[in-house]
């Protein structure tokens, strides 16, 4: 038989329970199945949240986490580079390229330029233009290159009504893979490359993961995570050899007056990075 005191205690407990907030499932769960190969449940409330990145206010502009390599003012992020020094890196001397009207233009016979910083996996945005005056043909017309880690080249070339070998035209992974389509603009018009580069991985001197490239040319996908056969070679088959995990980005000087502007890069990391 309930006493008055027992009844009052039960009422008090019931009121307290009714005021306990329910689990907020909008923020996640811990009673759902585990994701295969991961230490997290489906919709896990303990999973790290992605870092916040602020997009640019203008199309093609650098987001808040980008490293601006060229802003139209100077080449302070670059050094002169000659291929007889190393595949990556530079000479330590200032580039001799021309700066004008917000762009950098390669000056024939002054060598390539290489970034002072070194990079592994990355996202690159670069805008370029072949010379407006048509000179030469095939590989002699507006030739340059974007060379990741000083080894893996995406070709720059005036490919507007300019026949050449397919794996050497603009946006080719040079000597290996032609682009899926030719998205070339006319000579002198600005063009864009947006490239995701995945660096190769080595363990004990052996290749365990090749390099991959995803390339958008003027907004059009022309390489979809395409595997590189190895460092770029001319008239040879590429082969991998052990290399540093990070190395410089190189802009090639092929003795054509190619222009570049608005160059920025983002270091890429994996999923589930610790929150800062």
What are these model-derived regions, one by one?
Residues 19-276:
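Carbohydrate-interacting regions of secretory-pathway proteins
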């Amino acid at each position: 038989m309930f006493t008055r005191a027992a009844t009052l205690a039960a009422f008090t407990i019931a009121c307290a329970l009714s005021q306990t907030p329910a689990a907020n499932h909008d923020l996640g769960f811990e009673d759902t199945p585990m994701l295969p190969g991961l230490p997290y449940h489906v919709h896990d409330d303990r999973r790290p949240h992605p870092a916040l990145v602020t997009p640019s206010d203008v199309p093609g502009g650098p987001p808040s986490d980008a490293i601006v390599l060229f802003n139209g003012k100077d080449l302070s992020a670059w050094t002169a580079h000659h291929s007889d020094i190393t595949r990556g890196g530079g000479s330590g001397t200032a580039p001799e390229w021309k700066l004008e009207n917000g762009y950098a233009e390669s000056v024939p016979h002054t060598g390539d330029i290489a970034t002072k910083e070194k990079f592994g996996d990355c996202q690159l945005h670069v805008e370029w233009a072949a010379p407006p005056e048509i000179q030469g043909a095939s590989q002699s017309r507006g030739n340059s290159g974007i060379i990741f880690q000083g080894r893996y080249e995406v070709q720059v070339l005036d490919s507007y009504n300019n026949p050449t070998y397919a794996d050497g035209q603009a946006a080719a992974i040079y000597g290996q893979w032609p682009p899926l389509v030719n998205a070339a603009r006319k000579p002198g018009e600005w063009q864009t490359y947006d490239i995701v580069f995945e660096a190769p991985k080595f363990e004990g001197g052996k290749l365990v993961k090749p390099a991959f490239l995803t390339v958008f040319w003027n907004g059009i996908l022309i390489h979809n995570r395409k595997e590189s056969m190895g460092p770029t070679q001319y008239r040879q088959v590429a082969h991998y050899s052990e290399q540093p995990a990070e190395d410089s980005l190189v802009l090639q000087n092929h003795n054509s007056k190619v222009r570049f502007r608005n160059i920025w890069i983002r270091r890429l990391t994996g999923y589930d990075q610790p929150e800062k």
